[in-house]
Amino acid sequence: MQLTLWTYEGPPHVGAMRIAASMRGVHYVLHAPQGDTYADLLFTMIERRGQRPPVTYTTFQARDLGGDTAELVKRHVREAVDRFQPDALLVGESCTAELIQDQPGALAQGMGLTMPVVSLELPAYSKKENWGAAETFYQMVRNLLKEQTPANNQHDPMTWQHQGRRPRVNLLGPSLLGFRCRDDVLEVQKLLTLHGIDVGVVAPLGAGVEDLKRIPDADLNVCLYPEVAESSCSWLERNFGMPFSRTVPIGVGATHDFLVEVHDMLGMEPPAPDEGYRRSRLPWYSESVDSTYLTGKRVFIFGDGSHALAAARICSEELGFTVVGLGTYSREMARPVRAAAKALGLEALISDDYLAVEAAMAKAAPELVLGTQMERHSAKRLGIPCAVISTPMHVQDVPARMSPQMGWEGANVIFDDWVHPLMMGLEEHLIGMFRHDFEFVDGHQSHLGHTGGAGAADHSALTDIPADGDDALHWTADGEAELKKIPFFVRGKVRRNTEAYARDVGCRVINSETLYDAKAHFKA
């Protein structure tokens, strides 16, 4: 266990809450102490929902541990069933309750309830939120469909041709607290409808128990979010013979590949290769003269597996960026992320330590960071522009407007979101030319982040660099001014090299001449 002020994922029972809150007619009884009852804020504040999550807490206290906590579980299960009348009941325990080994799921299953009871065993000390969401959705699908499992798991995705109807697919994986899931579903539905493909079931987002039972009626499954749906799609493929698509349609190239994959599986004529150029503005923008300032921009990418992989492809193939860092906190997605990083000549960063991510970001010296809410904070400290591409996210990353990431419109949104933090070419030149004029205020809000400043500096001042003993270094005002003329994305590296050079030669005061000497030294 690690003590930290930030975590990329919550414990697995938060993933279970996401599934329960995403569905209709499902209630979750969570065996948990008072301190674990914080879920309401996640959904009402961050997700901007008007409804509280369908969760009942047993809220045991320290004095209850000397008595019969099993009876406490049963009482809360009865009360939840009587009050909410759910179509299906999820029963599990929080990370703290796991320690007392009450097995609430088994207790609930032995109560003779009329609705399906799904017992969740989510190891809180070895797994995390996305795994918990995937396991919960998998257990829901498995428990509700096990009686429909055919003896022969042969499934023909071209059955629609013989039945004289349009092909039908399911969209699996979208959930609450996912990144733009609501908007992605609408965009993918629109995309498929334009190609003559109907959408049968969307799950877990907005689905009920009866909807899950209709999953086998479709011709194939679309795995929109592998972190949540891949295990369920694999089970449906093994037991029902239902194939599923593996391409996540984020970006122009991936959207085209997704359509080709789905059309091939359904036995349909694939779409035209130039459809992306006709329906999305991203290809035209990225090839226009105005976007030449994007070419070669250094980008650091970190997020969940699906969005990090999609961002790496868009940056390298569609926008002409240079990817200088790629990583994920999703250990379940480590293998494909490592493969993508290797193809880009990089070593993937697989970590859930935000400090390690910040250190890697500083070392890579990018011009743009694509990451989570935490990377936005880290990038601001480093003075680097940032766009959020993945959960965990802030409420400001859940816009009221339609803002998908998938499909043709998603590609347009991505172009805007990623380019807006960057300074345009002319703006960059003007700021470089006039930065030292007295009218220019460093503290002005800009796309580079809120680094602040104090306008004109006192040229007689010295800047102290904390160090041990007699090794303290001092930057003079003219040295700092010269350093500011260096592009921000390599400024940190130049500062470190100059300080290392100054220590090597025994120089305690760093001025512009020291900076030039260090530059010559490292170029030699």
From Swiss-Prot:
Q: How is the cofactor bound?
A: Binds 1 [4Fe-4S] cluster per heterodimer. The cluster is bound at the heterodimer interface by residues from both subunits.
Give any Pfam family that matches: PCP_red
Positions annotated as active site in the UniProt record = 290
What are the BP-aspect GO terms? light-independent chlorophyll biosynthetic process; photosynthesis, dark reaction
* UniProt key word Transcription regulation: no
Where substrate binds, per the record, is at: 425-426
* Enzymatic reactions: chlorophyllide a + oxidized 2[4Fe-4S]-[ferredoxin] + 2 ADP + 2 phosphate = protochlorophyllide a + reduced 2[4Fe-4S]-[ferredoxin] + 2 ATP + 2 H2O
In what pathway does it function? Porphyrin-containing compound metabolism; chlorophyll biosynthesis (light-independent)
Cofactor section: [4Fe-4S] cluster
Q: What is its EC number?
A: 1.3.7.7
Which enzyme class? oxidoreductase
Q: Which UniProt keywords apply?
A: 4Fe-4S, ATP-binding, Chlorophyll biosynthesis, Iron, Iron-sulfur, Metal-binding, Nucleotide-binding, Oxidoreductase, Photosynthesis
Which positions in this protein are listed as binding [4Fe-4S] cluster? 36
Q: Which SUPFAM superfamilies does the record match to this protein? A: Helical backbone' metal receptor (SSF53807)
| A GO MF term | oxidoreductase activity, acting on iron-sulfur proteins as donors
| Subunit and partners | Protochlorophyllide reductase is composed of three subunits; ChlL, ChlN and ChlB. Forms a heterotetramer of two ChlB and two ChlN subunits.
**What does this protein do, in the record's words?**
Component of the dark-operative protochlorophyllide reductase (DPOR) that uses Mg-ATP and reduced ferredoxin to reduce ring D of protochlorophyllide (Pchlide) to form chlorophyllide a (Chlide). This reaction is light-independent. The NB-protein (ChlN-ChlB) is the catalytic component of the complex.
Family per UniProt?
Belongs to the ChlB/BchB/BchZ family.
- Which named protein is this? Light-independent protochlorophyllide reductase subunit B
This protein's species is: Synechococcus sp. (strain CC9605)
